Regions:
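Long, basic/Gly/Ser/Thr-rich N-terminal segments
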Residues: 1-74, 81-82, 86, 270-279
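Glycine-rich, often acidic-flanked micro-motifs
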Residues: 3-28, 39, 96-109, 124-130, ...
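Short, flexible segments with low predicted structural confidence
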Residues: 69-71, 77, 93-94, 223
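Pre-Walker A adenine-sensing motif
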Residues: 85-100
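Conserved glycine(s) of the Walker
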Residues: 113-115
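Post-Walker A alpha-helix
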Residues: 118-119
Length: 279
């Protein structure tokens, strides 16, 4: 039986698997999280008999014969369950986050806005990794790490080569699972070398937007009020708009600055950000 316990925010998550392939997959998916000696709040168990079952705290979540299918189900339930337990102590923002000079920079936006691409570029340039999807805002204005692996939906990425990722010290992992049509899909995971395991004070909030028609990146600074009106839509746990706005205003430090960047080339976007904000 393979076992491990890791921490996220103020909770611990326990994993155990009787299935060897599932254990390898779970180890890769959770490898960037720091070990914890706390009693787990959430315990995911994979059991093997005639088929394979996945359970959370004793309640069955999924059952099947394909280990990749079990791994895919685990990954979905893992992130949803963690966020559910962390809120409201932590506010989970749909945003990537990196550490720059021991301060947190958040890239918030909808899917395909380019936040993961900019996050990846910053990591290639030596920044510290906190998250590519879940930025956990504390009541003291810090971002807690949620370092799940970077994940490519395809074998290749339009902006980054495998060699670029490897040159930055990133390790590679993957798992395979059947899609809804029964076709085998490979999830390619990248494991950054520089991972931040302690919370960092939030300093920059950036709203990226990818636009293929833009000739050169455009960076603008926006008012705090404008940014706060936009941020609630990016919270994973929705509630009344006025309550979300009040919570964000109380938690985000007064010295934080807010920006938009419009870009079609992530490498040029990073050059502009570095020169304008991080020099």
């Amino acid at each position: 039986m393979w076992k491990r316990t890791f921490g996220v925010g103020h909770i611990a998550v326990g994993l155990e698997s009787e299935h060897r392939q599932c254990a390898r997959d779970l180890e890769a998916i959770t490898s960037l999280f720091a070990d914890s000696d706390k009693e787990p709040t959430l315990t995911f168990s994979i059991r093997q008999a005639d088929d394979i079952s996945l359970s959370l705290n004793g309640e069955e979540l999924w059952r099947g014969s394909d280990p990749g299918e079990i791994t895919a189900a685990f990954e979905v339930h893992l992130y949803v369950s963690i966020v559910h337990k962390l809120v409201p102590e932590l506010a989970s923002i749909h945003a990537a986050c990196v550490g720059i000079n021991n301060q947190a920079c958040v890239f918030a936006g909808v899917s395909d806005a380019g936040k993961s691409s900019i996050c990846t570029k910053t990591l290639l340039e030596g920044c510290d990794y906190l998250s590519d999807e879940f930025s956990l805002l504390t009541d003291t204005g810090e971002i807690e790490p949620f370092p799940r692996p970077l994940q490519w939906g395809k074998e290749e990425h339009p902006a980054f080569t495998h060699q670029m990722m490897q040159n930055a010290g990133m390790k590679q992992a993957s798992f395979k699972f059947p899609d809804r049509n029964g076709n085998i899909v490979t999830a390619l995971l990248w494991l950054p070398k520089r991972v931040q395991h302690k919370p960092l004070p939030l300093r920059w909030v950036i709203f990226p937007r990818y636009d293929a028609s833009v000739k050169a990146p455009e960076l603008t600074t926006i008012r705090r009020g404008e940014a706060l009106m936009e941020l609630p839509q990016h919270l994973h746990q929705q509630q009344r708009a006025d309550l979300m706005l009040q919570m964000l205003n109380q938690r985000i430090p007064k010295e934080a600055t807010f920006h938009r960047i419009l870009f079609n080339d992530v490498h040029e976007a990073w050059k502009l950000l570095k020169h304008s904000l991080f020099a």
